[in-house]
Design a protein with these regions (language model features):
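An extracytoplasmic/periplasmic, membrane-proximal ligand-sensing/linker region
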Residues: 180, 282-325
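Periplasmic-binding protein-like
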Residues: 111, 126-127, 185-187, 194-195, ...
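Extracytoplasmic ligand-binding site segments that recognize negatively charged/polar headgroups
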Residues: 23, 27, 31-38, 58-61, ...
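A ligand-binding cleft/hinge motif common to bilobed small-molecule-binding domains
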Residues: 87-91, 211-229, 278
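Short alpha-helix C-terminal cap/hinge motif
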Residues: 39-55
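Mature extracytoplasmic/periplasmic domains
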Residues: 240, 249-303
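Sec/Tat signal peptide C-region and signal peptidase I cleavage site
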Residues: 13-19
Length: 325
């Protein structure tokens, strides 16, 4: 009888009344732009107003260097990471630095967008394709088009030695295109230039210094919307992608709040925020931003983060040998 009465009383409680109210502090280390990071934090605070979140924003290599220094000092400060690429996350997982979130709801997400053991989770798909100036002699539709005589000396791209996205792109293309590294040998033979970051590529192609550029999608798409003479294509063979994964550090002092942050980022509402910010959301049911084709028209090539981590030094050496860097 007492059990029945208790069950009845529980049923009358408002939803969430039995759940522990989250509070305390969280520190997020992120490579997101400041505005994007704050909007993500605001989404958490809308549901959990007693959680106080601060963030440190920098490029992924500098974030990692900061973490390394803190690990060595025995004083890690971050609870959460939201950075550019899964290869970095895979390295931290291998070192035992990440806390798995076994309760994360990833039912809607395809394989490859998260760690199978739930240590990290993709939040976006930032693909790399081909931008071209509207004065270019032809509209590229294939990666092979950058090897055409008409493109000789007119191709620019970030170097995998300096850009994480470019390193993932190289690993993806050489792992999927027939001939592997012969494609990069062909680019070098066609006088392609490798150096700088994606911002430099955008400036070069939009300004007409080079007619073709290998670049992340959102930069030229946004620049075109502002009136710049630039177009972007998703090559027919497929594209590489970095996924801006989120993860919880094992040293967190507030694991439940950290898990709530991950849950919100992975939720449909959190993924729609990525859409509003102008990115391709990792959630397959979320629409794409203005200026993009349909999701079905974009083929994302397979990518193995663990293999890319194991091959990182070899891939950098191979690229440097080809391009003399």
């Amino acid at each position: 009888m007492k059990r029945l009465l208790l069950s009845a009383l529980i049923a009358l409680l408002p939803a969430g009344a039995l759940a522990q109210e989250l509070s305390g502090k969280l520190v997020l280390y992120t490579s997101q732009p400041n505005t994007d990071a704050q909007q993500t934090i605001d989404a958490l605070k809308a549901k959990h107003p007693k959680v106080d979140v601060s963030f440190v924003r920098d490029g992924t290599p500098r974030i990692l260097a900061k973490l390394r220094a803190e690990f060595e000092a025995g004083q890690p400060q971050a609870d959460l990471l939201l950075i550019a690429d899964s290869v970095t996350m895979e390295g931290l997982k291998k070192e035992g630095r990440l806390l798995p979130h076994e309760g994360a709801d990833i039912a809607a997400y395809p394989a490859g967008t998260h760690d199978p053991q739930k240590h990290w989770f993709a939040t976006k798909l930032i693909t790399t394709g081909i931008a071209y100036n509207t004065k270019a002699l032809f509209k590229p539709a294939s990666w092979a088009d950058l090897l055409k005589p008409e493109a000789k000396g007119q191709v620019t791209m970030p170097s995998p030695l300096n850009s994480g996205a470019a390193l993932i792109h190289a690993a993806t293309l050489t792992g999927n295109l027939e001939g592997g590294w012969k494609y990069y040998e062909g680019l070098k033979a066609n006088n392609a230039v490798a150096g700088g970051g994606n911002g430099d590529i955008l400036k070069s192609v939009a300004g007409g210094e080079k007619l073709y550029g290998v670049i992340v999608d959102f930069m030229p798409i946004r620049e075109k919307a502002k009136g710049a003479p630039i177009e972007f294509v998703f090559p027919k063979e497929g594209v590489s992608a970095v996924s801006e994964p989120v993860a919880i550090l094992k040293n967190t002092k507030n694991p439940e709040a950290a898990k709530a942050f991950v849950d919100i980022v992975l939720s449909k509402e959190g993924q729609e925020l990525a859409l509003k910010q102008g990115y391709i959301a990792a959630h397959p049911a979320v629409a794409l931003p203005a200026g993009y084709p349909s999701r079905d028209a974009i083929k994302v090539l397979p990518f193995d983060a663990a293999k890319a981590l194991a091959d990182e030094t070899k891939n950098k050496t191979t690229f440097a040998d080809i391009f003399g860097q």
